[in-house]
């Protein structure tokens, strides 16, 4: 209870032997033991009464809270709070590795298809030529437009289009089997 070491108890015993004397030590030990027993029983009784008061006071509140929580759908409530328009969910649902249709060049009144080659097959010259062509002729593939439109609201539109045009950073190797 008080975390006494054996050496401290021995020092207390020696001091008691010297102060009280060997003749009165058994009576003093009985008195100390009686006081410790009484203190323990009072502490246990107090603890029991406090526990009973806590149970009586909180049980009704706990029941009401539990009944209120029983009908709550936490997943639905969190998704409604964090993503009210569903834009974050659609961002994570899109597959960036899915094949995209050929890009459309919006030049005059009509749109025509452009040949699409894998990113890793482009040379540096082709890449710079394509970049200048994209900015000059406003090339927008339907996949790029869709990815830019589904970008989260906090991303500016210009940045959304730039990041949607970029090829993915990781292209998995072809299956060898």
Swiss-Prot record:
GO molecular function, one term: protein transmembrane transporter activity
Transmembrane segments: 1-21
One Gene Ontology cellular component annotation held by this UniProt entry: TAT protein transport complex
InterPro entries hit by this protein: TatB
Keyword Transferase: no
Family as reported in the entry's similarity comment: Belongs to the TatB family.
Entry protein name: Sec-independent protein translocase protein TatB
Source organism per UniProt: Granulibacter bethesdensis (strain ATCC BAA-1260 / CGDNIH1)
């Amino acid at each position: 209870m008080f975390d006494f070491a054996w050496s401290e108890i021995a020092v207390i015993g020696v001091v008691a032997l010297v102060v009280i004397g060997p003749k009165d030590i058994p009576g003093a030990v009985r008195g100390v033991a009686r006081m410790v027993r009484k203190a323990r029983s009072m502490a246990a009784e107090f603890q029991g009464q406090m526990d009973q008061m806590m149970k009586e006071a909180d049980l009704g509140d706990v029941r009401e809270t539990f009944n209120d929580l029983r009908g709550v759908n936490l997943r639905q409530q969190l998704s409604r709070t964090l993503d009210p328009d569903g834009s974050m969910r659609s961002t994570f649902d899109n597959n960036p590795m899915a094949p995209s249709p050929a890009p459309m060049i919006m030049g005059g009144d009509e749109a025509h298809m452009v040949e699409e080659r894998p990113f890793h097959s482009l040379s540096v010259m082709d890449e710079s030529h394509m970049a200048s062509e994209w900015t000059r002729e406003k090339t927008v593939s339907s996949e790029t437009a869709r990815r830019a439109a589904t970008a989260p609201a906090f991303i500016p539109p210009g940045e959304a289009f730039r990041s949607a045009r970029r090829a993915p950073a990781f292209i998995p190797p072809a299956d060898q089997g």
